[in-house]
Amino acid sequence: MLGLEGPCWVGPGPDGGLAVSEEFGDVRLFGSARQPLGSLGGWTGHTFGCPAGICSNSEGNVIVADEQRRQVTLFPRAGPPICLVSEGLGQPLGVACAPQGQLLVADAKDNSIKVYQGLKELA
């Protein structure tokens, strides 16, 4: 996969593909045969600060932690991006989707893993 600009994080993309975040850039998507499909910023007009961790949920939506903007954003298959979490995040680096539907966020600012269910942080 060539043409990347400062690749930082790689994660599963929709339909068996890959998603790659670029430092202070965009998030590029690749198909299951590793062919370039485009970028989330290009498709949605979303401007990233510093995209970091990436995951895909069971519906095939891509979720991105943005370290600089201190938020986690969901990119649905259709429609505009949706900010899932912004309050209480200091430096979100990693994200993961748990099988039970929870969203896990690694926050490097306070050295914690935050667990969200239905967009509310669980204790």
Swiss-Prot record:
Pfam families (alphabetical): NHL
NHL repeats: 35-78, 79-119
SUPFAM superfamilies the UniProt entry points to: NHL repeat
Disulfide bonds: none
Chain segments annotated as transmembrane: none
Keyword vocabulary terms for this entry: Repeat
Protein name per UniProt: NHL-repeat-containing protein 4
